[in-house]
Regions:
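Short, well-formed alpha-helical segments that are part of the catalytic scaffolds
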Residues: 15-28
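Short beta-strand/loop segment that forms part of the nucleotide-sugar
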Residues: 33-42, 63-68
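A conserved acidic beta->alpha catalytic loop
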Residues: 25, 40-49, 92
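Glycine-rich, basic loop-to-helix element that forms the pyrophosphate-binding segment
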Residues: 67-83
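Cell-envelope/extracellular polymer assembly enzymes that use nucleotide-activated donors
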Residues: 4-7, 35
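Conserved nucleotide-sugar donor-binding catalytic segment
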Residues: 129, 135-175
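Conserved donor NDP-sugar-binding/catalytic core segment of glycosyltransferases
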Residues: 100-135
């Protein structure tokens, strides 16, 4: 198997009932250059067994870590620590991805030169309810590269999907 380029990270706590939907969306990805990294923050439901079944399916690359309940920020920091890909994207257990999400992100990233990548902390993408309806407003016209705060200062409203360079997240862990 090829080296993966992006980690889809999911912190979870007692969300076994929701993980299957996300798993199904990951199996449908048109690009498989990702791994799914799950940090279980002390679940007492069927999360561990469910993830073990996903791993046995062997359809996508999955890494699973269990920690005693410590909070989402601690789970996030562990995810970043255990990540071995250039890019890191947090996708919550109650979310799912469009079939081309990984492909779209990687195509965008691959167009950047190494020098350009060092100037960027990552990629901001739309989040939506489905492929037709985004959450909030479109990005301001002409703002292809900007700091996140500048997007919002220039009229962007609503939630976004954030894909970060893993090395940047390592420099700035959650307190």
């Amino acid at each position: 198997r090829r080296m993966k380029e992006i980690t889809i990270f999911t912190p979870t706590y007692n969300r076994a009932n929701l993980l299957t939907r996300l798993y199904q969306s990951l199996k449908m990805q048109t690009c498989r250059e990702f791994q799914w990294l799950i940090v279980d923050d002390g679940s007492t439901d069927d999360t561990k067994n469910m993830v073990e079944k996903f791993i046995q399916d062997d359809e996508i690359a999955i890494k699973y870590y269990y920690q005693k309940n410590s909070g989402k920020h601690v789970a996030h920091n562990l995810g970043v620590k255990m990540c071995d890909t250039e890019l890191f994207c947090c996708v919550d257990s109650d979310d799912s991805l469009t079939n081309d999400a990984v492909q779209t992100v990687l195509e965008c990233w691959r167009k950047k030169t190494t020098d350009e990548k060092t100037l960027l902390s990552g990629i901001v993408a739309y989040r939506g309810y489905n492929t037709e309806k985004i959450i909030g407003t479109e990005f301001p016209a002409g703002m292809n590269e900007a700091a996140l705060k500048d997007l919002y200062a220039n009229g962007k409203k609503g939630d976004t999907a954030l894909v970060y360079r893993t090395d940047v997240l390592r420099q700035y862990p959650f307190p």
